[in-house]
């Protein structure tokens, strides 16, 4: 029996909230909080007849730590689920520390304003020292580890699919399939079609910043950075077919390099259609992906935020998206002295997700793991204090929960490898 404060009411949060309400014996009470309370009220009214979970709602500006603290003190939750924006990770972590409450999120911190001088100085130092230039990294949140540990609290970082489930797949492979892991390739394939010439399947601002950044991968103990979208491979995905995929920088590479240090190479690939790439490159060329404010008719606007307002809301894509996703990890390594390969992945159907929770599969594959991560903390399956990523915990109960609540795994012991 637990009380959970869920901050966020977008596409991913909606899925996570639906799934929490399917486990009322654990999620006894939830409070849905967002900047726009009307969205929370609408979702609560939709779910109330379908669950015995007690649902309340609240308004909060998660950019303001004092507002989050006031809400936590008023609601007294056992856990805060941050399913808002990664810009707000640190303010919510500060509030959890101030109130003595466990924390979890689905994506690591990145700043909204990448021109902020204080942040920029730290960022440029990290670029030189670490060797990759993506705006997002774990260092800001890892810096909280001692504070959470001393407070007797747990902060679970990145319990989505990638990051999240992909790291659990790595922990599972290390625990059950390999003595040593040599290489990890994380493959994220979306074979869905929403019918638009251009749209993003999750927050456009976050998505386009991620995809337009230089790619990077971990090899032989250091980062290798490449121009954005410059490494392309083809792969045939189960139940989807052959797709073009591109090497990206992705946050779980950073934590996996730390926690599976014997891995000689770790890469992340994501599929994209040609229409998406053509539109993205055009928008980048004309400055629409910029985070630097510009003056327009006497008013400052951020180009990428203006673009977000013009694009379809990812939460609206559910009814029109058809096809499947396939996300997983391919490993090479050794077991009992012998070379071995292994592939563990999930296939998810967009229309089945929509029929269950009114969402497309991209939000579903992030929202379900968010609920399952919360489940691990609330039921005492994961109890390590401090700030931790998913692969640092026992993967077995987490993957069993994913199997049960909508994201079952598949395996291959003879997969095609990525060159």
Language-model features, listed with the residues they occupy:
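Rossmann-fold cofactor-recognition segment
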Residues: 50-64
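C-terminal catalytic/substrate-binding lobe primarily of soluble NAD(P)-dependent oxidoreductases
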Residues: 175-419
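Glycine-rich Rossmann-fold phosphate-binding loop(s) that bind the pyrophosphate
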Residues: 9-10
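N-terminal Rossmann-like NAD(P) cofactor-binding module of classical short-chain dehydrogenase/reductase
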Residues: 72, 78-81, 103-105
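N-terminal Rossmann-fold NAD(P) dinucleotide-binding loop
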Residues: 13-14
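Glycine-/Pro-rich loop/turn segments that contact NAD(P) or position catalytic residues
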Residues: 86-89, 93-202
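Helix N-cap at the beta1-alpha1 junction of Rossmann-like dinucleotide-binding domains, i.e.
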Residues: 35-39
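Conserved Rossmann-fold cofactor-binding substructure of NAD(P)-dependent oxidoreductases
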Residues: 61-77, 88
